[in-house]
Amino acid sequence: LSGPAITGDKTSIKLNAQYTGTTAQTVGQRIYIWEGTGRGQYAIVDTFNEVTKVATVKKEFDNTPGWQHLLGGFPIADPLDPSTKYFIEPRGSFSEPTYSSASASLPIAGDYYVGTHGRIGSSNITVLLGNGRGSRTTDGVNFTACSGVSTATWNDIEANANKFISVSSSGVVNSSNDGATWSDISGSVGSDTFTGVAAIGQTWIIVSDTGVIYRSTDNGSSWTNAQVEPYDGSTPIFKFVAAGNGLFITANQYGQTWESVDDGVTWQLAANVGLGVGGPKYIAKDLVFKNGKFLMPVQDSPLDDSTSLNKIFVTNANVAQSSTSAVTVWTESDTLPHSGPYKVTGMQGTFVAITANGETAYSYDGISWKQLTGTLSGTYDKIV
């Protein structure tokens, strides 16, 4: 059944007067907005009043009130209006797969601070790095020791189709073509307090505390740099960087973001026109690009008098959109099942987040989250 809506909001929709379905026929069905305001939103009909034609809706993911979006990261429209066209259709349901975790032994004992995965040739390779140590796996179970890893305080690591690069706060940069054998390429990059690294194709970007951004267009062989933001000698500038959808985004600790739509040649202060993502009540904890989305976990800011729950902000920003708009829209997640703050990763349409204490949660859109059973032992800095 389909038709235009009369009105609606974030938890309900008023169907048109011609809708003749009964409460029994309507409740439990899926409703999908295919055109107009709210396009892409979907939900389960939770209640329906046959007289007023008002249906309340709940999310398929966790049965809480509200809509989800097929492309998670887009804001939910409020209000809906007569341009809103909907389908009501039967809803199939399936049991979610069971979740389990297992420990893996690493060949070199010690703390590991950064990690990433990449597809190099025909192999899926995951690499973990610590101070002077590294471990590599192609199956997540069996790890072998890396060689040549420098003694450094690693801040970030990234992979493209044929290379890994890791950066440190001590100015050391390492690279590897296979994740197993590493070499120091600091001499070709320069010396700085490096905080993040990202890549699109053969173009690599390294960001620093000092406001300098380093760029390579030949897969890390040679580098140029530019002072993108002024540095006062003490206040860190860039803390994170991520890349995807043709877009590079870097951020400072307050969640202010800068975007580049031309492979890192130029940068523009973007999110909220100078305010941090989520506003002054949050500070940023990370920035990643996974499953086609940028995600920024945030923490309640000690600089703001209010107390805010730790969240994750999500955007589907891409190079075409950012080329025509100076403001990137970030959508605030629902409340996560633990106090956080979180680090987050994603693969094959699923996001997984972890706290420092090993509490885990998962999501299919980065907005709605459920708790995974049990708490992992240990202390966690990153999830890959």
Ranges and model annotations:
Residues 136-137, 175-176, 216-217, 260-261, ...:
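Conserved Ser/Thr-centered positions that define the repeating blades of beta-propeller domains
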Residues 134, 172-173, 212-213, 255-256, ...:
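Short glycine/acidic-enriched loop and turn motifs that connect beta-strands
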Residues 104-108, 147-150, 186-190, 228-232, ...:
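Surface loop/turn motifs at the tips and blade-to-blade linkers of beta-strand repeat domains
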Residues 93-140:
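An edge-strand/N-cap motif at the start of beta-rich repeat modules
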Residues 122-128, 162-166, 203-206, 246-250, ...:
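Entry beta-strands of beta-propeller and related beta-repeat scaffolds
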Residues 94-101, 141-144, 180-183, 220-224, ...:
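Beta-strand initiation motifs
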Residues 109-119, 152-160, 192-200, 234-244, ...:
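Repeated scaffold domains used in trafficking and secretory/extracellular systems
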Residues 1-77, 81-82, 87-94:
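Autoprocessing Asn-cyclization modules and mimics
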